[in-house]
Amino acid sequence: MEPTNDAETLETQGEVTTAIWPSSQILKTTIDIPGTLSHDGRYIQYNLFGHIFELPAKYKPPIRPIGRGACGIVCSAVDSETNEKVAIKKITQVFDNTIEAKRTLREIKLLRHFDHENIVAIRDVILPPQRDSFEDVYIVNELMEFDLYRTLKSDQELTKDHGMYFMYQILRGLKYIHSANVLHRDLKPSNLLLSTQCDLKICDFGLARATPESNLMTEYVVTRWYRAPELLLGSSDYTAAIDVWSVGCIFMEIMNREPLFPGKDQVNQLRLLLELIGTPSEEELGSLSEYAKRYIRQLPTLPRQSFTEKFPNVPPLAIDLVEKMLTFDPKQRISVKEALAHPYLSSFHDITDEPECSEPFNFDLDEHPFSEEQFRELIYCEALAFNPETSND
């Protein structure tokens, strides 16, 4: 799977360091952080702007902060056993609430289950020095140089071929995810990691859930700007079509270098998308609740805008695909497999090189009300699976 000859690589500009994890602030430094030995020299503590990273000795300098988000600091390091540069995400105070603990455990299990070129690879879950009392979890992933959010905010030139190749890779990864009966539920530019060679990988599966057979579909999902209309209208039995809507929004943001629907709140978000795709017909209201139908009916009727006229810089075939993705009725929305086979992506599409997951992911952990101690033990066992020769009992 290679980009076309016209798809230029992303430039590496000097010492610029870009967050490789969803982040609210980029940290740039070329200063080596000194370490302090702990636990009889088995671990080394690094102070990254007031955040203590306690890493096994195999993770060698340079230890550098590369991003900061709600979960804390992300740093880069070198795995001395493989000589690979890695990204280490520290999730702090994981067991303060069961939602965060479950989200962390779910993400670890999903990343272990997945094996795909367009999904970020997990390398390690660092074994805590103390089995029964650790509060922080460190997840180690392959290091990617950029994320799409920061790339779109930068001066980096992106061509139409970049947009096509990114769209293809997102859909290729999503096909694999959906084939495992998993919905990502939080697709957005900051959850799409990029390399200098334009390779794209999907990350952050903490909000992922099973496809509709599950009865656990009511938790908050999807950053507002990328949220499908059925979610904005309170549907709790949504399908994989919500991810397709998000991809359509992301693609148009790549092509136009600005968000497609930058809603200020839930009401404004719905207004913005209806101003573009028009007020839905009675048939399109489909399986929405009666309350949602009444709400739509009382809104001013809005005509559908011409995508071609509004976005003249976007190729006609791309417009055709996006219109099929941004369809109000999720039952009429194009599927990932159909999107991959769309003529716009014909230069990349190869069904023999678009693998599916060999078996569905088991979401059994969502059915159990685990205690803090049980979550701690389950996450420790995940770390032990990566480090079978070590046990810090």
From Swiss-Prot:
Catalytic activity: L-seryl-[protein] + ATP = O-phospho-L-seryl-[protein] + ADP + H(+); L-threonyl-[protein] + ATP = O-phospho-L-threonyl-[protein] + ADP + H(+)
Positions bearing Phosphotyrosine: 220
Motif placement: TXY: 218-220
Catalytic residues (positions): 186
Regulation: Activated by threonine and tyrosine phosphorylation.
Residues engaged in binding ATP: 66-74, 89
UniProt keyword annotations, A-Z: ATP-binding, Kinase, Nucleotide-binding, Phosphoprotein, Serine/threonine-protein kinase, Transferase
GO biological process, one term: auxin transport
Highest taxon above the source species: Eukaryota
Phosphothreonine PTM sites in chain numbering: 218, 223
MF term (GO), any: ATP binding
Top EC class for this record: transferase
Family annotation (Pfam families): Pkinase
Record bears the keyword Acetylation: no
Post-translational modification summary for this protein: Dually phosphorylated on Thr-218 and Tyr-220, which activates the enzyme.
InterPro entries: Kinase-like_dom_sf (IPR011009), MAP_kinase (IPR050117), MAP_kinase_CS (IPR003527), Prot_kinase_dom (IPR000719), Ser/Thr_kinase_AS (IPR008271)
Residue stretches making up the Protein kinase domain: 60-345
Domain observations: The TXY motif contains the threonine and tyrosine residues whose phosphorylation activates the MAP kinases.
Alphabetical list of PANTHER family matching this protein: MITOGEN-ACTIVATED PROTEIN KINASE
Family: Belongs to the protein kinase superfamily. CMGC Ser/Thr protein kinase family. MAP kinase subfamily.
Subunit description: Interacts with MKK2.
Name by which UniProt lists this protein: Mitogen-activated protein kinase 10
Organism: Arabidopsis thaliana
Gene: MPK10
